[in-house]
């Protein structure tokens, strides 16, 4: 056997990344838009790999300035989709052209919700391994509401246009579907401001309050049996069939498969502080009341 071949090997890999879609080539406008998006999203997208999609702009992009703007927000670019002169400019700036494909949503499944431990283990960022509950914060201000949410959507849907250019994509064609866990991650303690929990390859169930400033993230569905006052993201790896369920909706930010809404104003009375679900309808985020 050739011992030199043991030093390394080549394997196929699937990489999930943020797709930053440019609608303008003006550096000032791009930086302002990026600043606002990141301020709205908090730490959701920090340190996530980025693929820049410049196919919608004809004007030349200032690639060094754009790359610096992304770096300032801890968004490392790993590739580009562009055409003609912009493609060459991106190459000159050190970007690698990539092909994008859309991930297939997983089929709905019955989740065994037997809890592991009450407290999840730390994780660096959204798409990394294991579950996370990080950072200390101030006191909680309410008790958890244990009322179960009925998953059948009722009336009073609120249609929300896409706010972000995050589309979870694949830089390479996948060779296998990521494994789905047989049980959901269950958290039975309220989450305080500054805490984050991430359920990898499964659903997340929080029995208690998610305070303002806390974040709950899952590759599958997010269930909050209590007031949801922080940020919630379902389908973190691009599962467009994922949903968010809560018995009391009062969130700062809602996201499914990267399509998100910052809740700057109070929701409709039929939704605010009521049982609700959040789902994707094409590229539109819908918030719907749940009837008991």
From Swiss-Prot:
One family name in Pfam for this protein: MinC_C
Region (Disordered): 107-186
Keyword Cell cycle in record: yes
Acidic residues biased stretches: 140-150
Biased composition (Polar residues): 171-185
Biological processes, Gene Ontology terms: cell morphogenesis; division septum assembly; regulation of cell division; regulation of cell septum assembly
Biased composition (Low complexity): 128-137
UniProt keyword list: Cell cycle, Cell division, Septation
Function, in words: Cell division inhibitor that blocks the formation of polar Z ring septums. Rapidly oscillates between the poles of the cell to destabilize FtsZ filaments that have formed before they mature into polar Z rings. Prevents FtsZ polymerization.
Assembly behavior: Interacts with MinD and FtsZ.
Sequence similarity: Belongs to the MinC family.
Name used for this protein in its record: Probable septum site-determining protein MinC
Species name: Bordetella parapertussis (strain 12822 / ATCC BAA-587 / NCTC 13253)
